[in-house]
Design a protein with these regions (language model features):
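Ribonuclease/tRNase effector modules and their secretory precursors
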Residues: 1-92
Length: 92
């Protein structure tokens, strides 16, 4: 199993958008990889949240993490992380 490394940009986006490194790792390890732009990959995973979001101070039941990453020969490099908050469960 390849190690997962987050770029500086990905780490900053995780802080700003409310994702943790553990959530990103779980998402990459458990999700179905899809092709993204420029030879990268993406996947999504929905987590129970049941909290107030730090980004807009609203309550949400779910948080979906979407890392964009490169599958290199010796590691997986996370380029950026998108985070979506919702009150509806999504089938991924």
């Amino acid at each position: 199993m390849k190690p997962i490394r987050c770029s500086d940009h990905a780490r900053l986006q995780m802080v700003l958008r409310g994702a943790t490194e553990d959530e990103v790792i779980v998402t990459i390890r458990s999700g179905k990889w899809e092709t993204a732009k420029m030879g990268k990959f993406r996947t999504k995973h929905q987590f129970n949240f049941d909290k107030i979001s730090l980004t807009n101070q609203k309550f949400y039941k779910y948080k979906t993490i979407e890392p964009i990453f490169a599958d290199e020969s010796n590691e997986i490099v996370v380029v950026t992380v998108k985070v979506y908050y919702s009150n509806e469960e999504v089938k991924l």
